[in-house]
Amino acid sequence: MAVIGEKFPDVELLTTHGKLKLPEHFIEAGKWFVLFSHPGDFTPVCTTEFVAFQKRYDQFRELNTELIGLSIDQVFSHIKWVEWIKEKLDVDIEFPIIADERGDLAVKLGMISPFKGSNTVRAVFVVDATGTIRAIIYYPQEVGRNMDEVVRLVKALQTADKGYATPADWPNNELLKEKVIIPPAKDMKTRAERLEACKRGDISGYDWWFCYTNLKE
């Protein structure tokens, strides 16, 4: 079962856009990707999710991030489902969908729960441009995902790469609003420097271990 911080496994997969090597394809392109599994094609909750992901596709692309769907259905089922969504809902699904028919990748990533049947649960894997798994979320089959949270998660992870942490509900935190947290000082010298920076107004803080600032682009 995959965990945060490890490399995404090297696999070659069949998708609605042809064969795809992960994470190699996106490492070479210098892109992040969000891999999300769904229980099955031609199901109501999954259909609403795919429409929602597609409507936010431009937001993900602005974050240098691509989308990939996955289920254990055949690629022919994926293709017909995408056609149905276009015909009935007038939404063109532009991202690829993996046909993991034998469930090899789904099992490797822990997307199938023995307590929830043989289909994949609603998993979300955020993988950065080095092929490292940065975040994992699991939802049960009966609960649709919050797409705004997935977008927020990618933004927060990319913000963390700039040396900051993000507070609860960022960028709408009750205490800090859109500001970001400076990681706590780990030695006395840095502690003193933080306190001085707060006095000068260079940064803000409640104490030496709880300092925050505006996000610098």
Swiss-Prot record:
Predominant location: cytoplasm
EC category name: oxidoreductase
Any GO BP annotation: response to oxidative stress
Domain of life: Archaea
SUPFAM superfamilies linked: Thioredoxin-like
Active site: C46
Additional information: The active site is a conserved redox-active cysteine residue, the peroxidatic cysteine (C(P)), which makes the nucleophilic attack on the peroxide substrate. The peroxide oxidizes the C(P)-SH to cysteine sulfenic acid (C(P)-SOH), which then reacts with another cysteine residue, the resolving cysteine (C(R)), to form a disulfide bridge. The disulfide is subsequently reduced by an appropriate electron donor to complete the catalytic cycle.
Record-linked NCBIfam families: PRK13189.1
Subunit comment: Homodecamer. Pentamer of dimers that assemble into a ring structure.
Name of the molecule in the record: Peroxiredoxin
